[in-house]
Amino acid sequence: MNKKFKKIVTEKKLTDAERIKENSNYLRGTITDDLKNEITNGFTGDNFSLIRFHGMYQQDDRDLRIERNEQKLEPRYAMMLRCRLPGGVIKAKKWLKIDYFASKYTLYGTIRLTNRQTFQFHGILKKNLKDVHKMLHSIGLDSLATANDVNRNVLCTSNPMESLIHQEAYEWARKISNFLLPHTKAYAEIWLDQKKIVTTEKEPILGKTYLPRKFKTTVVIPPYNDVDLYANDMNFVAITKNEKIIGFNILIGGGLSFIHGNKNTWPFLATEIGYISVENTLSIAKAIVTTQRDWGNRTDRANAKTRYTINNFGLNEFKKEIEKRANVNLKPVREYSFISRGDRFGWIKDINNNWSLTLFIQNGRIYDDNDKLFKSGLLKIANIHDGNFRITSNQNIIISEVSEKNKNKIEKIALSSGLINKSTNLRKNSMACVSFPTCPLAMAEAERMLSFFITQLENIMLKYGVEDEVIILRVSGCPNGCGRSLLAEIGLIGKSIGRYNLYIGGNRIGNRIPKIYKENITEQEILIHLKYLIKTWSNERKNKEDFGDFIVRKEFVKEVINPVYDFWS
């Protein structure tokens, strides 16, 4: 361990987030008191942060802020709740209750699929929170540890029934998720009214003050990188033999968030550290998490994530500590490669001769509006489907394990409700975070602007004869990275209302960070620049060259090789 760095860190004052965790009594705080408080619809003091460990964020409708302020009213507080759903798999019949709750108990009546393979509700009033937790519990689900300084929802390559390997990988995602969960009984006591029976508690893996920052994990089956592994803290890349997983390549330290203007923050790709046999999976997971727990920076949250810890101590030192704690020697990385990270839309036959139908859900927003009857369509499918729904890391949904007798019925519903539609490859490979009106961190629109923006970009691509090509396009309303714009070929990151930084030069498979091309420009200015770039790409690319590769080859931006030094240069 770098003793000099350790001394500097320990001499600094811990962040207030650390005080909150230390004093929380294992995430209880005074949340139960706030639930009884009818004067405000929000949570107060430390509880505002603590509810995140229970899977909720306090938000307000930013479209109404000024109006409510003028009326001397508090903001329209409501909670966003995110379900824990490792691998994104849920029984179709369970969807019936999820749909019912969204319709009856949320302000917006929608369900949002996320790029972390789960769903979330927006607009839950405080008085309805216990109802949603009890509803989730009744169908075997919860929202524990889907936010704040813990291991978040574990991702897994989609459609695990496509092969025995997919099913095995999904089971590992579940095992890792359960293994790294907080042990506190606070969630059950507060939301499910279970009596406290344990007088002393311990968190053997996460510790009393949990992790320094959020921590994200994936399980990946090459050649598909649909989970965007390079954006995650801890990754298990499956190595197989005879249709069985025999081990994992381990990659650590990925992450995309940064702060505008703060050159001490930067995105970073997860880095290979070695190979393990499958029986060492949980011990390695524990070693990585506890090393980050103990070595991570608790004095500066902007530099608290795993990638900064590795940068501070050095990759070799971090790796040695993992091996020491796990009592495992990491072997050389085994060969693997990726060919894409998009979803495969349409029907696919699985290992049991059943069918899976992958549906494109733009921005993951499930709602009903005019010809888009996504919500009622999925409800109709859930009523007749005996299998699963599988949420993908691209915010789409797979109707899986469809029997031959139900295949035509489900297809008819999907067609009539607009769930099967003719979308361009550009649109199908786009993504946006939620942003306005509910995200308190949003600087610019994302989800609400994306569809119209894509339509204009589609017209440009049509004009230059590349309308069928794939370009990875992503929009984030702020630099926190939720929309994964910094793994896109074209990435927009909000700077202020109507203005974005334009990043270009990422690649198709998601292992190159794009670089800023233009700063603080409007949507129309972005389209002007992209029109020129797409025209040039159409005329000068070599051998069906991807857009991002062309951008780097022609040096419209310099390739980001080590973002610690060249992301900002």
UniProtKB/Swiss-Prot annotation:
EC number assigned by the record: 1.8.1.2
Catalytic activity, as annotated: hydrogen sulfide + 3 NADP(+) + 3 H2O = sulfite + 3 NADPH + 4 H(+)
InterPro entries: CysI (IPR011786), NiRdtase/SiRdtase_haem-b_fer (IPR005117), Nit/Sulf_reduc_fer-like_dom_sf (IPR036136), NO2/SO3_Rdtase_4Fe4S_dom (IPR006067), NO2/SO3_Rdtase_4Fe4S_prot (IPR045169), NO2/SO3_Rdtase_4Fe4S_sf (IPR045854), NO2/SO3_Rdtase_FeS/sirohaem_BS (IPR006066)
Keyword Iron-sulfur part of the UniProt annotation: yes
GO molecular function: 4 iron, 4 sulfur cluster binding; heme binding; metal ion binding; NADP binding; sulfite reductase (ferredoxin) activity; sulfite reductase (NADPH) activity
Record-linked Pfam families: NIR_SIR (PF01077), NIR_SIR_ferr (PF03460)
Keywords from the UniProt entry: 4Fe-4S, Amino-acid biosynthesis, Cysteine biosynthesis, Heme, Iron, Iron-sulfur, Metal-binding, NADP, Oxidoreductase
Residues holding siroheme: C482
Cofactor: siroheme; [4Fe-4S] cluster
Domain of life from the UniProt record: Bacteria
Free-text cofactor note: Binds 1 siroheme per subunit. Binds 1 [4Fe-4S] cluster per subunit.
Transmembrane stretches, start-end: none
Binding site for [4Fe-4S] cluster: C433, C439, C478, C482
Signal sequence, renumbered to the chain: none
CC per GO annotation: sulfite reductase complex (NADPH)
Enzyme class: oxidoreductase
GO annotation, biological process: cysteine biosynthetic process; hydrogen sulfide biosynthetic process; sulfate assimilation
Metabolic or biological pathway, per its Swiss-Prot or TrEMBL entry: Sulfur metabolism; hydrogen sulfide biosynthesis; hydrogen sulfide from sulfite (NADPH route): step 1/1
Subunit field text: Alpha(8)-beta(8). The alpha component is a flavoprotein, the beta component is a hemoprotein.
Role this protein plays: Component of the sulfite reductase complex that catalyzes the 6-electron reduction of sulfite to sulfide. This is one of several activities required for the biosynthesis of L-cysteine from sulfate.
Protein family (similarity comment): Belongs to the nitrite and sulfite reductase 4Fe-4S domain family.
HAMAP family: CysI
Identification of the protein by name: Sulfite reductase [NADPH] hemoprotein beta-component
